[in-house]
């Protein structure tokens, strides 16, 4: 019987720990403040921003919402970020992605002060991760490491396969597993003999962006499967990149969708807010 890794419960534990930490900081007259910028009214982005605001409220983190119209120019957005960079009372800045086509994402990410880069996307944050230095960690991969550790799953010495090579999940995930002394392979759309590689994995992280792509033919008996995907199927039901029902009886542990990786991403964003405020700001 597979262990169902409960991201909701584990993220709740982390938020409770952070709530106590923020309360302690407040008793010293120190405040953690996150500025969240959203351009346009993409429904999914609006939901994510709402979830981040709720998590801030729960942890005692002050949040500032900047809801900009879709026609906001790149220059206007960069000017706002620079204003927030200069504000001593703002300890973290997050720009909700994706951005409209007329705004260059990389330019926006690079404009955020690396000391306030709570998403962990700035080249300075990514560089620190790649050479093993302390710094902001990309939230989803950091959340996955916490899921594994807090579920008693050892990473050291394990054969780890990451399916997907995005800058947000795949690449930083591989680096974090390497940092934990896993033996890491990255697969992607051009990988040949994919199932031969995935069937070697003790820990398989699936972030490929295709609904129910991973079936039991790709998984060895007793593997741990982490599903990063989030989609709606033809019946409007949430599902991941893993065909959960097909795989669940073959694995030793698996994350569900929803309730697995998703809540951890927000918990680790809150963790980054507190970490950064303490390290750089207050």
Swiss-Prot record:
* UniProt: NADP(+) binding residues: 164-166, 189
Per its record, how is this protein called by name? Bifunctional protein FolD
The record, for Pfam families, names: THF_DHG_CYH, THF_DHG_CYH_C
Which Gene3D superfamilies does the record match to this protein? Answer: Leucine Dehydrogenase, chain A, domain 1, NAD(P)-binding Rossmann-like Domain
Task: Name the SUPFAM superfamilies for this protein.
Answer: Aminoacid dehydrogenase-like, N-terminal domain, NAD(P)-binding Rossmann-fold domains
Q: What pathway or pathways are given for this protein in its record? A: One-carbon metabolism; tetrahydrofolate interconversion
Catalysed reaction(s)?
(6R)-5,10-methylene-5,6,7,8-tetrahydrofolate + NADP(+) = (6R)-5,10-methenyltetrahydrofolate + NADPH; (6R)-5,10-methenyltetrahydrofolate + H2O = (6R)-10-formyltetrahydrofolate + H(+)
Q: Please, one GO biological process term?
A: purine nucleotide biosynthetic process
User: EC number(s) for this protein?
Assistant: 1.5.1.5, 3.5.4.9
What's the name of its gene?
A: folD
Q: Which UniProt keywords apply?
A: Amino-acid biosynthesis, Histidine biosynthesis, Hydrolase, Methionine biosynthesis, Multifunctional enzyme, NADP, One-carbon metabolism, Oxidoreductase, Purine biosynthesis
